[in-house]
Regions:
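Residue(s) in the substrate-gating loop at a strand-loop-helix junction
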Residues: 143
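Substrate-binding pocket helix/loop in short-chain dehydrogenase/reductase
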Residues: 94-95, 102-107, 212, 223
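Short C-terminal tail/terminal secondary-structure segment
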Residues: 3, 148, 241-243, 254-266
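Short, small/polar-rich loop/turn modules that mediate ligand/substrate recognition or access, typified
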Residues: 175, 180, 253-255
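Active-site helix of classical SDR
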Residues: 118, 159, 167
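Canonical Rossmann dinucleotide-binding motif of NAD(H)/NADP(H)-dependent dehydrogenases/reductases
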Residues: 3-34
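Alpha-helical segment proximal to the catalytic Tyr-Lys
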Residues: 123, 172-173, 251
Length: 266
């Protein structure tokens, strides 16, 4: 039997990159997966390619979206065993050039969106879970910048640091429901957020506005050299790290921040 056979999972930001790879990994290990993404076409395409998966596109920066997304997962599966809070993006700026809009946007998607998803899930848990329930899993995606900080990444780092606080607090609140809550803090992973914008500019549409995403070739090379392994991680590397926190073998691990950074420690 696959290790996640009979389990159900919600993965946010699952249309591309880490989220897509995670949805595929969990499904390959037996879980039924709800694929959430801002981009409806992408979410539908990913779900259609995963046996038994369900697509539910939604903009998680809409305060009303989280209740609807969690409700859709509960309706589709009759319960929810795994929540992976992955949705997010990067908006670079040094503090002297940072607008209130940039600050608010990074806190909104990385902290507030996770809070709302977990609040909705928590309301269901209080009615349906106990210490005798099968172990359920929450995995919140943070970043090494949320642990160590990062130049020109104040808002992003603050949002990802908030994820750490959310994780450690809910691990204490939800242990009595037999729910483990952990975070995975990634270093540089090869996604469109870290692809070279000199070669092919990547535009992400958020709330109807375009955001340029990506890194310079110089930044990409620096990220590779910072790792003792000499490379950036792949989405599959990231998904494997998340899977470990969803698997039965991690049932006694909670409240932890797992650094999956290729050995980068600053």
């Amino acid at each position: 039997m696959s290790s996640l056979e009979g389990k159900s999972a919600l993965v946010t930001g699952a249309g591309r990159g880490i989220g897509e790879a995670t949805a595929r990994k969990l499904a390959a290990c037996g879980a039924r997966v709800l694929v959430n993404d801002l981009d409806a076409d992408v979410a539908e395409a990913v779900a259609a390619s995963i046996p038994g998966a369900v697509a539910f596109p939604a903009d998680l920066t809409d305060p009303a979206a989280a209740d609807v997304v969690v409700g859709a997962a509960l309706e589709a599966f009759g319960g929810l065993d795994i929540v992976v809070n992955n949705a997010g993006y990067i908006w670079h700026s040094a503090i002297h050039n940072m607008s209130d809009e940039q600050w608010d946007a990074m806190l909104d998607i990385h902290a507030s969106a996770q809070f709302r998803i977990l609040r909705a899930y928590g309301r269901w848990l209080r009615q349906n879970a106990s210490a005798d329930s099968p172990t359920r899993k929450v995995v919140n995606i943070s970043s090494t910048m949320g642990v160590h900080g990062g130049a020109t990444q104040l808002a992003y780092s603050a949002g990802k640091a908030a994820v750490v606080g959310i994780t450690k607090t809910l691990a204490k609140e939800w242990g009595r429901f037999n729910v483990t809550v952990n975070a995975v803090a990634f270093g540089a992973i090869e996604t469109r957020l870290t692809s070279p914008y000199e070669r092919e500019p990547n535009i992400s549409v958020v709330k109807g506005q375009q955001r340029k995403v990506g890194l310079s070739l110089e930044q990409i090379e620096a990220a590779k050299q910072a790792s003792p392994l000499g490379r950036m991680g792949t989405p599959e590397d990231a998904a494997n790290s998340i899977y470990l926190m969803c698997a039965p073998e991690s049932d006694w691990i909670t409240g932890e921040v797992i650094l999956a950074s290729g050995g980068v420690r600053s």
